[in-house]
Amino acid sequence: MIIYRQYHHEGAPVYEIITKTFQHVSIKCDDSFSDTEIFKLLSLLQDDIDHMKVS
């Protein structure tokens, strides 16, 4: 997973990531998450996205 962009939108952090299979995803998080929790969440999402079948 590569986090290639991080910014704030309406006060909430937004992360744009590229997964192992080169899928592009934008994730908007709640301010209550710590950096550690956000990276765990992004890792889980990356695995789910990489295993999804796209038609």
Curated annotation (Swiss-Prot):
InterPro entries (UniProt xref): VraX (IPR035374)
Name of the protein in question: Protein VraX
Organism, scientific name: Staphylococcus aureus (strain Mu50 / ATCC 700699)
Gene encoding the protein: vraX
